[in-house]
Design a protein with these regions (language model features):
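A residue-level detector for well-ordered beta-strand positions
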Residues: 12, 33, 53-55, 75-76, ...
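Exposed loop/turn and edge beta-strand positions of beta-sandwich/beta-sheet ligand-binding modules
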Residues: 8, 29, 51, 72, ...
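A motif-centric feature for acidic-aromatic and gly/ser/thr-rich catalytic loops and repeats
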Residues: 49-58, 64-65, 69, 173, ...
Length: 270
């Protein structure tokens, strides 16, 4: 921002099937990928000094082994419906269990667990994070259609105490499908309005920065080609969950929630 030349540039190259083969960045090195004939990754190397990763896929195009240099091989797990029950993300390994509708209901990592509830339209309406039996946070989500328009703190909610409004969101009305987020309003722990923040985006709909009316730039984001965070800074950076592709980032899980399914930037898969 306010520089005569871009601070970061991406130069993309593709193979004969139109798959991303390399992203040469002006800062951070090159991300490179090799695929099999069906489009599964065979190898990847993401950035300068990064270790290479090798992938093994079965006849159902499910990864059955992911091996990174100097790390023990990781073996993803699946249930009979094809849901992935063992995942590896930027925050570590998680065991995932699903409800009868094949919705991810519980994520477990050691003493930590994340529990999710959904409504009849398959929208996630609640996310609770526990350390052992201690509730660390509980968020409830309000939607207009499939666009999240509000987030409430329900950690202390009871029959007599309502959840507290913490965030509201404004979306681009000119793009009803695959839209982008335009603004976020923040509220304090009592539900009192604090401020509005406004988004800038790149051409891929990724949120690149947040600006306040008085305080200037409040957050900055940079991404790898498959959505991993390369740079995130600013005193409002973590307040904003809508980053890559203007979708909701679950920081605890290292996943991105796309309403119908979760995306894992670490291996570029849903």
């Amino acid at each position: 921002f306010n520089t005569p030349a871009p601070d970061l540039t991406h130069s993309y190259s593709y193979n004969g099937r139109g798959e991303l083969a390399a992203d040469a960045m002006s800062r951070g090195g090159t991300y490179s990928y090799v695929y099999d004939n069906i489009g599964n990754r065979v190898t990847s190397r993401e950035g300068s000094g990064a270790s290479a990763a090798a992938y093994t896929a079965n006849s159902l195009n499910q990864y059955t082994a992911i091996t990174r240099e100097e790390e023990a091989p990781f073996a993803p797990g699946y249930d009979a419906d094809g849901n992935q029950t063992k995942i590896q993300t930027s925050t570590g390994e998680w065991e995932v269990s699903y409800n009868a509708l094949n919705q991810a209901a519980r994520f477990i990592q050691g003493n930590r667990r994340v529990e999710c509830r959904y409504d009849y339209l398959n929208r996630r309406i609640e996310k609770a994070v526990y350390e052992g039996e201690v509730l660390m946070s509980k968020k409830r989500f309000i939607y207009h259609g499939y666009l999240q328009i509000a987030e409430l703190d329900a950690a202390d909610a009871t029959e007599s105490a309502m959840p507290v409004l913490r965030k509201t969101y404004l979306w681009d009305p000119l793009e009803p499908v695959a839209t982008r987020i335009l603004a976020m309003s923040l509220f304090d722990e009592t539900g009192t309005y604090v401020e509005d923040l406004y988004y800038t985006h790149d051409l891929l709909k990724n949120a690149t920065a947040l600006f306040g009316i008085r305080a200037g730039r409040r957050a900055l984001y940079e991404y790898g080609p498959y959505g991993n965070i390369l740079r995130m800074e600013g005193n409002a950076a973590e307040d904003n969950p809508f980053r890559f592709s203007s979708e909701y980032a679950d920081d605890e899980l290292g996943l991105v929630y796309y309403n119908y399914r979760y995306y894992n930037p670490q291996n570029g898969r849903w």
